[in-house]
Amino acid sequence: MPRRTDKTSDFERWSEALLSPEWETRLNATEALGKMKDKRAVKSLLAALKDEDEYVREGAAWALGQIGDQSAVPALIAAVKDKDKYVREGAVTSLGDLANKRAIKPLIQALKSGDESMRRTAEKALLNLGEPVIEELLLLLKDSDWDIRWRAVHVLGATKNKKACEPLIARLGDENRYVREAAAIALGEIEDKSAVEPLIKALQDENKYVREEATTALAEIRDKRSVSPLIKALHDKDWGVRWGVANALGELEDPIAIDPLIKALDDEVRYVREGAASALQRIGKPAVKKLIENLQDPSANVRRWSAWTLGKIKDQRAAKYLINALQDKDSGVQFAAEVALTELEE
């Protein structure tokens, strides 16, 4: 008998396969029906959610999420309590795909009570629900488990909802550094100016990673109030923070930062020097005069990065000074000047 290949026949063939005595055949059927996204399969897949084989149940949970029929929500909520962890995770993932409000409390419970893998899965699912989940997440910010607070902060940041801003600002003072770090990231994602002063304060946090994320958040919010505190933070003892500060000052593009950034061209860490040079490039033409002057700086690093940056800005005023720099006693400066002159000609 010739194999049937039209869509209707494929659907019927795979629906029949769900009744096969072989678990692998039933599993393949759930995968095929999920890929078809045909709502006629929902009833059969709901039955497969109760299959004796855990792989088939997991496949059915996945397929129901792919099809996207809201009638599957109650059964998937029930499957969150399945005895097999992978079935539970599959159900949580599909509830996230369906983004139904009825799933909020089961997903919150999965976030709170699951192992690391389940918590991560529930976190991703909650991200899909958007604004309806915010109130529940705000409650989790005071949970006794720092990991729960951390995940709630992460999801709230991803929603970009300004309603979360004030509670997230409070988490900048959390006893756990991972939560403080996540709060800084989240506030940067939301980009609300009410977070500027608290983030400036976070530049003094005892943990370097919190300070670094505060620089990134301030860069995303782009408020001029942060320029002076960021300049001060260019002297932070941790190079990662200094690098973050340089990037932030580049985003803010304030000429006030030109001199401090030029000094940072002599930082002991190359990444910071590169960040400072890139920031000066972002500031652009207002930085040209100072960069030209610093082609005579005692530090070879400053001369080298000044030449490099002048090439990136492409201001013809720098040409004759770069030609002179070709005679610099440092070969690195000579090379940077040569490259910069080539860029000026482009």
What are these regions (language model features)?
Residues 1-8, 24-38, 47, 54-70, ...:
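Structural detector for internal amphipathic alpha-helices that build alpha-solenoid repeat scaffolds
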Residues 12-19, 23, 43-50, 74-81, ...:
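HEAT/HEAT-like alpha-solenoid repeats
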